[in-house]
Amino acid sequence: MIEILGIGAATLALFVGFGLLIGILFGFFGMGGSFLVTPALLVMGYPSRVAVGSGLAFVFGTSVIATLKHRDLGQVDYKLGVLMIAGTTLGIEVGKRIVFFLETLGLAGSIISVTYVVLLGGIGLFVTYEAIQGDDGGGVDHEAEADAEVDAEEIPDIAKKIQSYRVPPMISLRGGISVSLWMILGVAFATGLLSGFLGVGGGFIRMPALFYLIGVPVPIAVGTDLFEIVFSGGIGSFLYAMDGGVDLSIVAPLLAGSALGARFGSAATSIVDESEIKVYFGLMLLGGSVAVAIRELGSYFEMPVLDTVSLVLILGSALLVSGMVVYSSLVELRRGSGQQSVTPE
């Protein structure tokens, strides 16, 4: 069998293709990287610390690519991003220590998998419900909202409630938002803890938290989330690499595929209404939750076929949602060109 980077050619092609799909999701949603990569590596039989550490290293590389594109679109709040980094750093170290402690007890793999099932399932249900109910207030003009002041009617009720608690010091953010520093640091620590424990960038929790809890406009929430993930992913992957938890034969082909996908996904935020895709993203989270649960059942009952089913679910969910992003982008581009062609001279 031909081997490249120490892995088989088929596995290499799988990683490159998977990286492409995840890059699209990462650039478009500001999330969608390691919360799919880490479970996939666990399903493929990699040790917990390698799955977590390699997931973080992948997140770091992909977030750099996507952040550069969002910076060009003016969708990064640097003040908010720097404050998030402060709380995230401590959370990552705490999460890493928990993983290493659980490994000494032989419980890391099972507990990480169960946590994934609960988090992905819960957030997936919430996002899907919000999308079906249409509570996001309609379409999102990604370019227009980057610098415009936020309309109070577009801020989620829970974010309005949180903003009403004026616990000093208060921080002014883009879009005319003012929120307590302690809320920002609290969200950052919680997502940092998840980054270190689960090997995720925290984006699948941080981006919704920035929007639903703090009231940051969706485009800025995505761009700022990615900016923060550059640092959380970098710090996390460095800490794991120091303890032999990063496998470059995994990370390199994933990054090769994601480089193109992340640029495309980031560009798509300026032309595609996220509400059109949100329900599919919620279903993808639910698919990931079911996939990890099936893997655990396969391990418990010693049924390898369930591991295969789990991997197919993870890859299939990524393919479905990234495909919808590409399809919606093409539809919007065609619609825009059609409108230009009928505009009178």
Task: Please name every model-derived segment.
Residues A267-L313:
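A contiguous, mid-protein "functional segment" used to position or interact
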Residues Q133-I162:
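Flexible cytoplasmic inter-helical loops of multi-pass small-molecule transporters
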